[in-house]
Amino acid sequence: HDEKKLQKIYFKDFGLRNNLCISKDFSHLFENLVLSELFKFKEDFFYNKYFNFYSQISKIAYISSPTLDIDLIKLRAKKILPKALELGIFHVIFITLSSEDSFFEQGVKFEVISFDKFSLRF
């Protein structure tokens, strides 16, 4: 991560996470599931308050948004655009349960894909 105050814990076995945690927050579980798929890349991923995960090598950021609709995703994309440009990220992927779309803002490609298509890409 790139901020000292922001620390997260992820599990390769998220069944273990469910057993250890009292609260069962689906969005956190979904985020952990996305990371499990990203492990297939065998590269380092970072996170900050704008992106769930991003690669400094491939210049791609990933945001797990299981329940946001397309309009809310587009609003969020406009808010994070300056940070994407600052980090040199030119492709941002929002992973959802079922929504799909893609659009460009100032040279940055924003892609909204469902988790099943995301996981089958690898």
Give the role of each language-model region:
Residues 39-42, 93-99, 122:
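Short C-terminal domain-edge/linker segments immediately following a structured domain
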Residues 65-114:
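Catalytic cores of nucleic-acid endonucleases
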Residues 115-122:
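Non-catalytic C-terminal interaction segments of nucleic acid-processing enzymes
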Residues 1-59:
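Accessory nucleic acid-recognition modules appended to NTPase machines
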